Swiss-Prot record:
Matches recorded under Gene3D superfamilies: 3.30.10.20, Phosphorylase Kinase, domain 1, Transferase(Phosphotransferase) domain 1
Domain of life according to the entry: Bacteria
Identification of the protein by name: Serine/threonine-protein kinase StkP
GO molecular function terms noted in the UniProt entry: ATP binding; protein serine kinase activity; protein serine/threonine kinase activity
Membrane topology: Single-pass membrane protein
UniProt source species: Streptococcus pneumoniae
Quaternary context: Homodimer. StkP forms dimers through its transmembrane and extracellular domains. Dimer formation likely promotes autophosphorylation activity and might be necessary for targeting StkP substrate. Interacts with PhpP via its kinase domain.
pH effect on activity, per entry: Active over the wide range of pH from 3 to 9.
Domain commentary: Consists of an N-terminal kinase domain, a transmembrane domain, and a C-terminal domain containing four repeats of the PASTA signature sequence (Penicillin-binding protein and Ser/Thr protein kinase associated domain). The C-terminal domain binds to synthetic and native peptidoglycan (PGN) subunits and to beta-lactam antibiotics, which mimic the terminal portions of the PGN stem peptide. Deletion of both the transmembrane domain and the PASTA domain negatively affects the stability of the core kinase domain.
């Protein structure tokens, strides 16, 4: 155990322990040489540091991994020894291993399972071309990054544990579920052994569980080369036959029926979901041939001698003549060969009978291995009664949607019906939660959180509910604006159909319109609706005789400007107001009628504020009735409501006739 916070090997600051394998501990560390980059440091456990076989295997496999530079293989960055401790540093993959991912998301959609398996195959193709067989492929040794990239790790390093401690049977349970039939018989692992393991992993991705299980490694290993592979389609009806055929061929028990290389499997897998293979027949192999069978080793002498001896009964004839009696040391002539052969045969036969009897006695002392009854279609109560009657215990109850099985009835058992298990084994029940489809409602205008909760209640997986945000000034943040599947659509839970909800979010930018000529009250209301703060809308009034009061004459910023409502930018609107003062026109030389009409109708002076006076003196050339003076004078400001205008009209004096 390395102390947390310690600087290991002069460059790795240990942050925490993140894993513990069969022979090594794994720590998250920061590489001080690479500016604190996070790495995973695997250290051979103390009790293996003195084992030359374990150390040699650890080093050999670490170097082999270091040669595998591939985007789908965990990269080795450093190999070394520190204070007698063998270690290797590798890239840190922040994500889940495939085992946990399957547990949380099973069954995976066909497309996702194919995508992940293609990545694993690409990684193993490189390894196999370099002469490296993994020997321990399982979901726990496949890591998934947050973006869904698969990375294979632990290239056979854990095999050193099996080599140096063969008696640790329980430690093999993690891998025996993916063990090829030839490995179970004791043969050497090959490229096709890795292919078999990938077939089992593929089965698990599409069904959510392993095909073979049991109480011991031996029981599971026997199933790998004795029991046919359970149907994938029976477990997951959405899987097409062409895709199941890939698994059937990858897990064929005879090597001659199995894919010869990962490239061959990759090509077949790549077209398994294509339209051209939609009517493919189920692949069936004759697995009865014994060509791949390996002869089991003979029973050792120590085993035979452990069988209790039985004293043979012999017939003693009376000796008529005592002198003819002989002692043990007395020489006796050998019996004829034929007689000796018969005696040996009888002794061998008796020994075999004793061995058989001993085995029967031993087996009778152990719990019987019996087939799990088929309880599919039964109610939970009926299934429990049937299993208890067969001397099985009841395990967990899980629910699963089903179009075929009525709600509350059994879909299947785990392990499956017909599988051999010992009495007392716990059998899990998979119970139908009802049909796999429902009608899509109208979600527009509703809160997205309520819609998501409703979809989850209807068993739609989280990864199939996609939220896309869109800025909106009209709708409250979090409100559903659009939905990808229209109201009334029948949604099939068995298919990985994505539901896309477009949800409103607070808009931060708007496009300013052309507000000139519009009423200022309407424009201010519109800007407020678009979340423009009221204190940033400035109104400036300007007198205008051409525009109706309240009408916008100018704006800043101009029309079409992108305005960020999160920034304190002021919008200035120049609004027309009624004219209250004007410059006094010049009316000198005009007639009284014209002057009054112009002042009232054009300038806006009230008639009551116009005073007309007559004067008798005027500039030369003036005619009667002409304006000769005005007050205010031309150009002076006139308040239309207050100023009195005085107009002087020339009226010459009349001269009386002299008598």
């Amino acid at each position: 155990m390395i102390q947390i916070g310690k600087i290991f090997a002069g460059r790795y600051r240990i942050v925490k322990q993140i894993g513990r394998g069969g022979m090594a501990d794994v720590y998250l560390a920061k590489d001080l040489i690479l500016d604190g980059e996070e790495v995973a440091v695997k250290v051979l456990r103390t009790n293996y540091q003195t084992d030359p076989i374990a150390v040699a295997r650890f080093q050999r496999e670490a170097r082999a991994m270091a040669d595998l530079d591939h985007p789908h293989i965990v990269r080795i960055t450093d190999i070394g020894e520190e204070d007698g401790q063998q270690y290797l540093a590798m890239e840190y993959v922040a994500g889940l291993d495939l085992k946990r991912y399957i547990k949380e998301h099973y069954p995976l959609s066909n497309e996702e399972a194919v995508r992940i398996m293609r990545q694993i195959l690409l990684a193993m193709r490189l390894a196999h071309t370099r002469g490296i067989v993994h020997r321990d492929l399982k979901p726990q040794n496949i890591l998934l990054t947050p973006d869904g990239t698969a990375k294979v790790t632990d290239f056979g390093i854990a095999v050193a544990f099996a080599e140096t401690s063969l008696t640790q049977t329980n430690s093999m349970l993690g891998s025996v579920h993916y063990l090829s039939p030839e490995q179970a018989r004791g043969s050497k692992a090959t490229v096709q052994s890795d292919i078999y393991a990938m077939g089992i992993i593929f089965y698990e991705m599409l069904t959510g569980h392993i095909p073979y299980d049991g109480d011991s490694a031996v029981t599971i290993a026997l199933q790998h080369f004795q029991n046919p592979l359970p149907s994938v389609i029976a477990e997951n009806s959405s899987v097409p036959q062409a895709l199941e055929n890939v698994i059937i061929k990858a897990t064929a028990k005879k090597l001659t029926n199995r894919y010869r290389s990962v490239s061959e499997m990759y090509v077949d897998l790549s077209s398994s979901l294509s339209y051209n293979r939609r009517n493919e027949s189920k692949l069936i192999f004759d697995e009865t041939s014994k060509a791949d069978t390996k002869t089991l080793p003979k029973v050792s002498q120590s085993t035979l001698t452990s069988i209790p001896k039985v004293q043979a009964q012999t017939e003693h004839k009376s000796i008529k003549n005592p002198s003819q009696a002989v002692t043990e040391e007395t020489y006796q002539p050998q019996a004829p060969k034929k007689h000796r052969f018969k005696m040996r045969y009888l002794i061998l036969l008796a020994s075999l009978v004793l061995v058989a009897a001993s085995l029967i006695w031993i087996l009778s002392r152990s719990p019987a291995t019996i087939a799990i009854p088929d309880v599919a279609g039964q109610t939970v109560a009926e299934a429990k009664a049937t299993l208890k009657k067969a001397n099985f215990e009841i395990g967990e109850e899980k629910t699963e949607a089903s179009e075929k099985v009525e709600e509350g009835r059994i879909i299947r058992t785990d392990p499956g019906a017909g599988t051999g298990r010992k009495e007392g084994t716990k059998i899990n029940l998979v119970v139908s939660s009802g049909k796999q489809s429902f009608q899509i409602s109208n979600y527009v205008g509703r809160k997205s959180s309520d819609v998501i909760a409703e979809l989850k209640e209807k068993k739609v997986p989280d990864n199939l509910i996609k939220i896309e945000e869109e800025e909106s000034n009209e709708s409250e943040a979090g409100t559903v604006l659009k939905q990808s599947l229209p109201e009334g659509t029948t949604y099939d839970l068995s298919k990985a159909t994505q539901i896309v909800l477009t949800v409103a979010k607070k808009a931060t930018t708007i496009q300013l319109g052309n507000y000139i000529g519009r009423n200022s009250t309407e424009v201010i209301s519109e800007l407020k609706q678009k979340k423009v703060p009221e204190n940033l809308i400035k109104i400036e009034e300007e007198e205008s005789s051409e525009s109706e009061p309240g009408t916008i004459m100018k704006q800043s910023p101009g029309a079409g400007t992108t305005y960020d409502v999160s920034k304190p930018t002021q919008i200035v609107l120049t609004v027309a107001k009624k004219v209250t003062s004007v410059a006094m026109p010049s009316y000198i030389g005009s007639s009284l009628e014209f002057t009054k009409n112009n002042l009232i109708q054009i300038v806006g002076i009230k008639e009551a504020n116009i005073e007309v006076v007559e004067v008798t003196t005027a500039p030369a050339g003036s005619v009667e009735g002409m304006v000769v003076e005005q007050s205010p004078r031309a150009g002076e400001k006139v308040d239309l409501n207050k100023t009195r205008v005085k107009i002087s009209i020339y009226k010459p004096k009349t001269t009386s006739a002299t008598p």
